[in-house]
Amino acid sequence: MKQLIECVPNISEGRDMNIINQVTAEIEKVEGVKLLDVDPGATTNRTVITFVGEPENVCEAAYRVVKKAAELIDMRNHHGDHPRQGATDVCPLIPISNITMDEVVVYARNLAKRFGEELNIPIYCYEEAASQPKRRNLAYCRTGEYESLSSRLGTEEWKPDFGPNEWNEHVAQTGATQVGARDFLIAINYNLNTTSTRRANAIAFDVREKGRPMREGGKVTGKPMKDENGNPIMIPGTLKSTKAIGWFIEEYGIAQVSMNITNINVSPVHVCFDEVCAKAAARGVRVTGCEIVGLIPKKVLIDAGKYYLAKQQRSLGVSEDEIMKIAIKSMGLDDLKPFNPKEKVIEFLIEDMTQKKLVDMTCTGFANETASESPAPGGGSISAYMGALGAALATMVANLSSHKPGWDERWEEFSKVAEKGQVLKDQLLDLVDEDTNAFNKIMAALQMPKKTDADKAARMEALELASQYATKVPFKTMNVAFEAFDIVEAMAKTGNPASVSDAGVGALCCRSAVMGAYLNVKINAAGLKDRAFADKIVADGAKIEAAAIKKEAEILEVVNKIINKE
């Protein structure tokens, strides 16, 4: 599955749309990157830019943004209400899906190094990318802002992580840039069945990490208490990594608790929702729902949906669409207005809507497309689809078993099987289209020019690479389909006996998927120049095929014994 990260550079220009457009145009030149938002502010004289994509592509787009901003923005002439010290003031990278924070930190520091070495801009790394504890704080890195940079540069304390440690004409124009790696920030408002801002604030103070000031006598009217240094003594709230206030919204005619969640791994959205509900209820107030401001990673809804399904002791091994529906209904995300994941979830917004997927067709449409004179989809895609159906059947048996009357205490056992089945099914569905894409790569290579010797050499190299890829894809189908035997076998042996025939058909599908994919491995490997690669993948495939045939026979023996009540 693709790794996705987000980048949110803030440039020090919020008034001149000509400059802003030139900077954002650089992002749109990078293939595989989606520009999500451009938010200029005249008062702050600052523009927040948001784009997303695979890490290497995002880093290239970020480099182009910083380079263009350095060319067009002169910090010597900049004035605005927001703290800043560079043409690109901050450039954080944020993990979205299938990537760890540690991996993002590596990308951030490599990007910072490139800014410093190639663009000669002083770079300070902050938050998770910081090289020293005090630099984790962005405010510290910007101490004194641009106006103090000339006196700070050249000192050991303010030596940049990358780039020049000196004040010169170039740095006077560009200023310094802060590069960070941070968690995704979510803005969420909880709708209350009250118009009281005071009640909303009380709930906000109950939950936000900062909490509320400690007062003499423990009364609201008591004098705020201070420590020996004169600082307010705070009673911490219950939710780490959160900030919150209460307010009244004229548009809706209700009060809300408005919250920023700065680390969804520490305080997931669903945990925050339940805690706000609990604190509100303790004050006689009810949370009727909530609204998410801006975009969110799909993980937020998936984690929430699974959390609420688990509370119901229902199987978690259902489709992502169903899981997200549970999340939306559980947290009342559609309380004030419709909530459409296609418009709010980052992963959906960056999907290539121009490319039609085979798996999005109807059964009839897919069969008709296969039967047409077009050579794709062919046996490789069909094999992957058979494997997906095999995994789906095992998942169905697991879900039926999970909810079987009298088996309530076993719901979690079957839920784990169903979850694994959903993962395998989705992997195989991806391979349906990937197999056809691999075939198309071969066709594209065959259509390359061959007029000159250089053309012919490039064409042959491209054809070899495409053919190798077209061999690897069905080989992956073999592996994933074979892995599905684990859940098929488990459901044949321990699942609902009334559905054992479904497990048997699942075994037939998985065996056919492995054998069909192996035929594609062999035919694509036959023409490869790299015989060592070809011979190895064919030999490895033969072992998987033999094991699949054996496993199918074992499962069918179990299935037939149960059907025949032997």
Show where each model-derived region lies.
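Conserved phosphate/anionic-ligand binding catalytic regions in large, soluble enzymes, centered on
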Residues: 9, 80, 85-92, 263, ...
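Amphipathic alpha-helical interface segments
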Residues: 184-186, 438-508, 512, 524
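Conserved small-residue-rich
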Residues: 353-413
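A structural signal for well-ordered alpha-helices, especially hydrophobic packing surfaces
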Residues: 397, 425-432, 439, 471-478, ...
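Long, contiguous binding/interaction regions
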Residues: 1-365, 372, 450, 458, ...
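A structural-propensity feature for long, helix-poor, extended segments
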Residues: 403-449, 544-553
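Non-transmembrane, amphipathic alpha-helical segments
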Residues: 50, 54, 195, 358, ...
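Preference for long, well-ordered alpha-helical segments
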Residues: 111, 121-125, 134-138, 484-487, ...
